[in-house]
């Protein structure tokens, strides 16, 4: 059994599709890639994504060990920096292949 979000799946492809298919998730993962980003930077990069939606999707990605939230306290203020975990980095070549396939076979 494979757990994605709060649902259990028999098929690993279905479990991963459940996560990657959620609104903004692909753009969040692809947008971070090889850099660390603060919440505000992510929100500005995702034009049209509400603060609430971004928080929900980041929580989903953190819970599924795709993104890491590095929290540091600076002058009594907690600063969160988000970046891809090892497993998140391993998704990038897969997502690149999905982009190439989509560009070749899906009508836009």
Where are these regions (language model features)?
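A basic, often C-terminal nucleic-acid-binding module that engages the phosphate backbone, implemented
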Residues: 68, 79-87, 92
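A short, conserved structural fragment
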Residues: 62-72
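N-terminal helix-turn-helix DNA-binding core of bacterial DNA-binding proteins
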Residues: 11-53, 72-82
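Amphipathic alpha-helical dimerization/coiled-coil segments
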Residues: 8, 30, 86-108
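Long, low-complexity, charged/polar intrinsically disordered regions in eukaryotic proteins
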Residues: 1-2
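Basic amphipathic alpha-helical segments that dock to polyanions
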Residues: 54, 58-61
């Amino acid at each position: 059994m494979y757990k994605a979000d709060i649902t259990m799946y028999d098929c690993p492809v279905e479990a991963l599709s459940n996560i990657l298919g959620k609104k903004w998730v692909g753009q969040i993962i692809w947008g971070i890639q090889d850099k660390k980003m603060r919440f505000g930077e992510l929100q500005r990069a995702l034009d049209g994504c509400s603060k609430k939606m971004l928080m929900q999707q980041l929580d989903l990605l953190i819970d599924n060990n795709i993104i890491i939230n590095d929290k540091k306290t600076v002058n009594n203020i907690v600063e969160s920096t988000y970046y891809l975990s090892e497993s998140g980095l391993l998704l990038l070549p897969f997502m690149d292949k999905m982009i190439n396939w989509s560009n070749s076979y899906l009508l836009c």
